[in-house]
Design a protein with these regions (language model features):
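Macromolecular interaction modules
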Residues: 1-208
């Protein structure tokens, strides 16, 4: 499985409410038309004391995660007419974007069917660092009331290809998706945590 994850910042002249509604109601259905798309979620960043200073400084509003069977399917989708339509629509609400192509690895299988409250961790670093990702996973496994953990090993990252949206100059050594049953569980687990990873609290919307 290959995951294409975008780091999205909304346009300065678009309110957070308008950004969320357009992303969910207009852009989301366009993405669902991609050939070969196996799974698609939108992770909407929400305000929380568990969101640390590193994350706040990046001003990221959302993380779309698109999964394909392999890189051939991903490249086919990214060169499709459906992707071209999405690139045009993105101009209406996205101000800057970066894309990270990853190999997802389930480190802790979800213990409940649906977990919509999650922590997205961007590990500090200019390039992929599998050892750092493994260390983060070992630490995250010890969090109280953890119900799921997915690691995203970085294969490539940079500007979104064929996009006319400005590039968001953010790099990462790896990503982790840490799931909890509730926002209360997440915030209690992260209270007092000190890390150089950027921690974003997100609400997940599954579209496919």
């Amino acid at each position: 499985m290959i995951a294409a994850i975008s780091l999205m910042r909304r346009r300065d002249d678009v309110t957070l409410t308008a950004f969320r509604r357009h992303w969910l109601d207009v852009h989301g259905p366009l993405v669902c038309r991609f050939p070969g798309l196996r799974h698609y979620v939108q992770d909407h960043v929400i305000a929380s004391p568990a969101m640390n200073a590193q994350a706040q400084g990046l001003h990221i509003d959302g993380f779309p995660i698109l999964c394909f069977a392999d890189d051939r399917e991903r490249l086919h989708a990214h060169s499709s007419a459906e992707m071209a339509a999405c690139n045009v629509d993105s101009r209406a609400f996205v101000g800057a974007v970066s894309r990270v192509i990853c190999e997802p690895q389930v480190a802790v299988s979800p213990t409940v069917a649906v977990a919509r409250t999650k922590l997205i961790a961007l590990l500090a670093g200019e390039a992929a660092d599998d050892a750092a990702l493994a260390r983060y996973a070992a630490w995250a496994r010890g969090l109280p009331r953890l119900i799921g953990l997915v690691l995203y090993r970085v294969l490539q990252q940079g500007p979104a290809p064929a996009s006319t949206i400005a590039h968001l100059p953010v790099s990462t050594a790896g990503l982790a998706e840490v799931a909890f049953a509730s926002l209360v569980d997440l915030e209690c687990a992260m209270a007092g945590v000190v890390t150089d990873a950027a921690h974003f609290v997100v609400e997940e919307h599954s579209l496919m």
